[in-house]
Amino acid sequence: MVKKVLLINGPNLNLLGTREPEKYGTTSLSDIEKAAIEQAQLKKNDSEVLTYQNNTEGFIIDRIHEARRQGVGFIVINAGAYTHTSVGIRDALLGTAIPFIEVHITNVHQREPFRHQSYLSDKAVAVICGLGVYGYTAAIEYALNY
């Protein structure tokens, strides 16, 4: 079982709860992070979830690199728009060799065509999209039991 999971959220996800609530719901990123941390605590086996959000690609890459040094065993990532553009985030995930799940609140395949391409999904253990914020719960549960 993985003891340490890193939950990464990319650009604009800090606006959850107020950004396009008809699409993303009204749950804030803070609420999602708190729920993930509590989910790990309920395991009662010293599991923990670390959380990180940044709007800047380079800082996200740096955080992925840091995860390896911290002994993170699994990453759950919603890279937001960087999903569709960032070779750098893909390479960072591959370079650290930490297994990861890609999460999206909306079903990206029902949205604009440019959102159908992911630079991450072919290397992810799994992709969860379209389940709303429950997708985070499912991903964290899987990661904690990996």
Curated annotation (Swiss-Prot):
The keyword Zinc does not apply. Keywords: Lyase, Quinate metabolism. It catalyses: 3-dehydroquinate = 3-dehydroshikimate + H2O. It holds the Pfam family DHquinase_II. Gene3D superfamilies: Dehydroquinase, class II (3.40.50.9100). The active site is at residues 24, 104. Pathway: Aromatic compound metabolism; 3,4-dihydroxybenzoate biosynthesis; 3,4-dihydroxybenzoate from 3-dehydroquinate: step 1/2. It comes from the Eukaryota. PROSITE patterns: DEHYDROQUINASE_II (PS01029). The record marks 19 as: Transition state stabilizer. One of its GO terms (biological process) is 3,4-dihydroxybenzoate biosynthetic process. GO terms for molecular function: 3-dehydroquinate dehydratase activity. InterPro entries: DHquinase_II, DHquinase_II_CS, DHquinase_II_sf. The keyword Lyase applies. Its EC number is 4.2.1.10. Substrate binds at residues 78, 84, 91, 105-106, 115. PANTHER family: CATABOLIC 3-DEHYDROQUINASE. Homododecamer. Adopts a ring-like structure, composed of an arrangement of two hexameric rings stacked on top of one another. Is involved in the catabolism of quinate. Allows the utilization of quinate as carbon source via the beta-ketoadipate pathway. Belongs to the type-II 3-dehydroquinase family. HAMAP family: AroQ. This is Catabolic 3-dehydroquinase.
